[in-house]
Structure formats: structure tokens, C-alpha cells
Design a protein with these regions (language model features):
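N-terminal single-pass transmembrane signal-anchor helix
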Residues: 4-32
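Sequence-pattern detector for short linear motifs
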Residues: 8, 40-44, 51, 90, ...
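N-terminal cationic amphipathic segment used for targeting or macromolecule association
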Residues: 19-22, 28, 36, 88, ...
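Aliphatic-rich helix starts adjacent to a transmembrane/signal segment
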Residues: 31-52, 61
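Alpha-helix exit/C-cap motif
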Residues: 52-73
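Extracellular/periplasmic head regions of type IV pilus-like filament subunits
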Residues: 66-130, 134, 143-144
Length: 144
């Protein structure tokens, strides 16, 4: 008599499951590295939006003032540019901790009206933009 049983044996199924488990164990650590890199890139992109929005609002204010006027950025009512306005223009959901704007120095080096530093935090990642930073930390953006 012929035995016409079709299908896999229990041993074959267990072997396949073990192989899949080994492959998953090898891939999961690599994937978490890619996920972290993607999160870093996302916070850098949002920080760039904040820098561009900051520079836009600072330029608008600076253009209306006398040459060499200082621009202040903050949450106080005395600030020329409000952080809430920057956040609204940048369309970001994170927290803008600080925005610094350069001033004209007595040595002739001028960064007046240029956003020189931005600190932005979102989803546990903090990105710091520094003007003229050249140490290779993702351009002028350093994520921690």
C-alpha cells in the first residue's frame, strides 16, 4: 500500500522556525541602529526648519531697524522675535529651547542679524545648530 501523506513533519517545521529565529536575532540589532539614525535625521530636519523660520523672522525685524540694531529672541514680551512665532512658522511640534542671534562686534567681525545658535528638542532627541561649526558633526547640527 502506498502512503500518500502530504505536508511537513513536525521536525521540519521546528527547523524552519529555528532558522527564522536566528535570522531575526541577527537583523533586529541592525534595524535598531537604522531606526536611531532615522530619528536623528528627523530631528535635524526639524531643527533646519526652526533655523530657517528663525532667520526669516529675524531678517524681517532686522530690516526694519537701524543698522547694527540688536535682535532679541525669547518668550518674554520684550523680545523682538517670539519663540512661539518661530515654532508656528516652522510648523514643528518639539520644544525650541533657545535661539541666539549674532551682534556687531567692536573688532569688525559681524554676525549681526544672523541666527548663530538654535537648540531644539523633540521625542527625547536634542539637536543644537551652531553657526560656522566645522567639526564634522553633521554639518552645523549636533544631535544628542
Amino acid at each position: 500500500m502506498k502512503n500518500n501523506k502530504k505536508g511537513f513533519t513536525l521536525v521540519e517545521l521546528i527547523v524552519v522556525l529555528v532558522i527564522l529565529a536566528i535570522l531575526a536575532a541577527l537583523l533586529i540589532p541592525a534595524l535598531t541602529g537604522y531606526i536611531d539614525k532615522a530619528k536623528n535625521k528627523a530631528v535635524v530636519a526639524e531643527t533646519r526648519q526652526v533655523v530657517m523660520a528663525s532667520q526669516t523672522l529675524v531678517d524681517e525685524y532686522y530690516a526694519k531697524q537701524a543698522v547694527g540694531a540688536e535682535v532679541t529672541v525669547g518668550t518674554e514680551t520684550t523680545s523682538n522675535v517670539k519663540i512661539d512665532d518661530i515654532k508656528k512658522l516652522a510648523e514643528v511640534k518639539g520644544t525650541i529651547t533657545s535661539v541666539e542671534v549674532g551682534t556687531t562686534s567692536t573688532t569688525g567681525n559681524t554676525n549681526a542679524g544672523i541666527v548663530t545658535k538654535v537648540v531644539y528638542t523633540n521625542k527625547g532627541k536634542t539637536c543644537t545648530y551652531t553657526y560656522e561649526k566645522t567639526d564634522g558633526t553633521d554639518g552645523a547640527y549636533d544631535v544628542k
